[in-house]
Curated annotation (Swiss-Prot):
Subunit relationships: Monomer.
Tree of life domain: Bacteria
GO annotation, biological process: base-excision repair
CDD domains: EcFpg-like_N (cd08966)
Keyword list, A-Z: DNA damage, DNA repair, DNA-binding, Glycosidase, Hydrolase, Lyase, Metal-binding, Multifunctional enzyme, Zinc, Zinc-finger
Assigned EC number: 3.2.2.23, 4.2.99.18
Role played: Involved in base excision repair of DNA damaged by oxidation or by mutagenic agents. Acts as a DNA glycosylase that recognizes and removes damaged bases. Has a preference for oxidized purines, such as 7,8-dihydro-8-oxoguanine (8-oxoG). Has AP (apurinic/apyrimidinic) lyase activity and introduces nicks in the DNA strand. Cleaves the DNA backbone by beta-delta elimination to generate a single-strand break at the site of the removed base with both 3'- and 5'-phosphates.
Protein name per the record: Formamidopyrimidine-DNA glycosylase
Single GO MF descriptor: damaged DNA binding
Listed Pfam families: Fapy_DNA_glyco, H2TH, zf-FPG_IleRS
Residues at the catalytic site: P2, E3, K57, R260
Zinc finger (FPG-type): 236-270
Cofactor binding note: Binds 1 zinc ion per subunit.
The organism of origin for this protein: Shewanella sp. (strain MR-7)
Length: 271
């Protein structure tokens, strides 16, 4: 599943081609995504795209009439293409621009979404209760400590909770906890402020580095140009269960935590 870095890489790739362009058509070939695609043509045709933003793992395409909320789901991608590019299987939506380009949404597994919001996006049900962005000052050790106070849940589950901080999915939660030396099953409310300070710094550094590397390509992710990301080459624990730790040489352990694969070093990461 594309996580925050992959969605941000997509945003950076499509934004220069969309901003200040006028929409001349919207072609929906398959409206049966995670949620049915609403009738958008009347709202969006003729509108000029003002900006392309990201909130958590959602892309927000703003016009004066409202905002398209796009989620890539498990396998979705957005690409900028010439308008006459042949349609392939799983090409579900084309946003057609006046400059002869299209924004094409491809999603083999159809867990993605393309919705419409005329409210301030902060009031949309999908967005209104989200926590702070991890790469902003709003995500800091004081905020995290307050959010974790009294919690008995495993720290990894809390780190992946979008009400606490957005966008830290399974890949980057594994990597950040390894970098911070914190066991993924450590009781969140008992982690001291010094270790939380390190964890916040590692989350920020790892996400920023992943964005710089173009995201992580494991199976499906490609950027707006159809190219893979390269952060997978730098993963220390995710997907490496049973292999040797890059720091101490111990074999990495693999467990299921919150129904997600969790990999850690029992020597380097402590409770």
């Amino acid at each position: 599943m594309p996580e925050l870095p992959e969605v941000e890489v997509t945003r950076q790739g499509i934004a220069p081609h969309l901003v200040e362009q006028t929409v001349v058509d919207l072609i929906v070939r398959n409206a049966s995504l995670r949620w049915p695609v609403p009738e958008l043509a009347k709202q969006i045709i003729g509108q000029t795209i003002r900006q392309v933003r990201r909130r958590a793992k959602y892309l927000l395409i703003d016009t004066d009439a409202g905002t398209s909320i796009v989620h890539l789901g498990m396998s979705g991608s957005l690409r900028i293409l010439p308008h006459d590019t042949p349609v392939e299987k799983h090409d579900h939506i084309d946003l057609v621009l006046a400059n002869g380009r299209i924004l094409r949404f491809n999603d083999p597994r159809r867990f993605g979404a393309w919705l419409w919001c005329q409210l301030p996006e902060e009031a949309h049900p999908l967005l209104e209760k989200l926590g702070p962005e991890p790469l902003t000052d709003a995500f800091n050790v004081n905020q995290l400590a307050a959010a974790l106070a009294g919690k008995k849940k495993a720290i990894k589950l809390c780190l992946m909770d979008n009400h606490i901080v957005v966008g830290v999915g399974n890949i980057y939660a594994n990597e950040a906890l390894f970098a911070a030396g914190i066991h993924p099953e450590a009781e969140a409310g008992k982690i001291d402020i010094e270790r939380l300070t390190v964890l916040v710094a590692e989350v920020k550094q790892i996400l920023a580095h992943a964005i710089k590397q173009g995201g992580t390509t494991l199976k499906d992710f490609t950027n707006a140009e159809g190219k893979p990301g390269y952060f997978a080459q730098k993963l220390h624990v995710y997907g490496r269960g049973g292999e040797t730790c890059t720091q101490c040489g111990n074999l990495l352990s693999e467990i299921r935590l919150g129904q997600r694969t969790t990999v850690f070093c029992g020597i380097c990461q402590t409770r």
